[in-house]
């Protein structure tokens, strides 16, 4: 199988169910790749469309020959120390077999252009410490790593 060149990939924003639905399989693969036990709900696209409509999430999809091969999602957060908003790259994923084609760079470029257009001056994200390929990719982009442990706490209703 011949791999298409990066120029064959396009990136678009997903804003409705039709645009978001093909991304669900990528989200499942991403969670598996990161060794997560999070279950991606069957109605994932509906939830994401609601977040997009509320202005809480932006979703970018990389497409090659009509197939979704990667995605990036961005939210806006605030940094208390600097008293400034920043963009948070919640997810960046390119399907196995579609990596090393420039798709990740295209997704990051779309995110950066979007973030700059919104007037935000910083993009932050995290990746598992064991994901050396991603760390190398981010460093090649010019990003700087900052060590920190990430925690999650599943809160039961009413607690």
List the model feature ranges, each with a label:
Residues 49-61, 88:
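A short helix-loop-beta-strand connector motif used in the catalytic cores of GNAT acetyltransferases and
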Residues 79-85:
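A short, polar/charged loop-to-alpha-helix boundary motif
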Residues 95, 128, 156:
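Residue-level recognition of the GNAT/N-acetyltransferase active site
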């Amino acid at each position: 199988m011949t791999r298409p060149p990066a120029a064959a990939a396009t990136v678009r924003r997903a804003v409705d169910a039709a645009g978001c639905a093909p991304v669900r399989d990528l989200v499942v693969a991403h969670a598996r790749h990161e060794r997560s036990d999070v279950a991606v709900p069957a109605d994932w696209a509906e939830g994401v469309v609601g977040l997009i409509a509320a202005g809480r999430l932006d979703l970018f999809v990389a497409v090659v020959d009509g197939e979704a091969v990667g995605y990036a999602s961005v939210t806006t957060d605030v940094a208390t120390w600097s008293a400034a908003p920043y963009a948070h790259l919640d997810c960046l994923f390119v399907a196995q077999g579609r990596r090393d084609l420039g798709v990740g760079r295209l997704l990051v470029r779309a995110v950066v252009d979007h973030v700059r257009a919104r007037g935000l001056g910083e993009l932050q994200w995290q990746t598992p410490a064991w994901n050396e390929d991603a760390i190398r990719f981010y460093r090649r982009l010019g990003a700087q790593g900052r060590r920190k442990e990430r925690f999650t706490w599943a809160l039961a209703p009413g607690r």
